Amino acid sequence: MNEKLKEIVTISEPRSPISEAYRTLRTNLDFAGLAKTLKTLVVTSAGVNEGKSTTLANLAVVTAQAGRKVILVDADLRRPRLHQIFGLSNEQGLTTIMMDDNALAAPPLQETGVESLWLLPSGPLPPNPAELMASRRMEEVIAALVERADQVFFDTPPVVAVTDAAVLATKVDGVLLVISAGKTRREYARTAVQRLQQINARLVGAVLTNVQMGAGFRGYY
């Protein structure tokens, strides 16, 4: 096993309460998608360092473990983290296929070491992330990825800090908001929800991370 994968709790401790919480999250999202299937999902946060990338990595793992083909896309073109979490290269990725038709036909997806889970890292960081998210090309990229997987998950920058997440949220089936207990200021969380509502994004739920549940429970929830 890739040593980095041991840092992903749903892989290293699949029977832990934390891993069970991620499976519960997966199930809740399935129910949220009864009216409209969540083929594409954006995961964002109100502010920085709130655990969105870790949350998304674990959600992707448990979704793949349920027998679905999952593509995890690092659309945080400012501070990409997913390639580090999985211990993979970031030389090519989302920005590569945004610029290259040949790459779009054969996306540089990387095997994560988890069956049925692939990562499309951010690739080289561009000077204009928000413009790329808003482009027609991004819609073509999403369509191409959906053809290759049962579900496509996107990691994005915090929705309050920059416009990238809000722009991408208008192009997907749903948005999951990550909030850190004891860190996210209430007004930031409120602003994040308001921004998503203003653009008519489909907010399917929120995840509270870094909750202290006592000595018998190590977890994010």
What are these regions (language model features)?
Residues I11, T63-P121, I142, T184:
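Phosphate-binding loop that captures ATP/GTP phosphates
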Residues L104, S122-V162:
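Phosphate-binding/switch loop-helix module in NTP-utilizing enzymes
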Residues M1-I8, R190-Y221:
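Hydrophobic micro-sites
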Residues R15-L77, R81-F86:
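Walker A/P-loop phosphate-binding motif and the immediately C-terminal alpha-helix
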Residues E147-R148, A161-G182:
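Inter-motif core of Ras-like GTPase G domains
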Residues M1-N28, N210:
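Acidic-aromatic/histidine active-site loop/patch
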Residues L77-R79, A103, P124-P127, V159-V160, ...:
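Conserved nucleotide-binding/hydrolysis micro-motifs of P-loop NTPases
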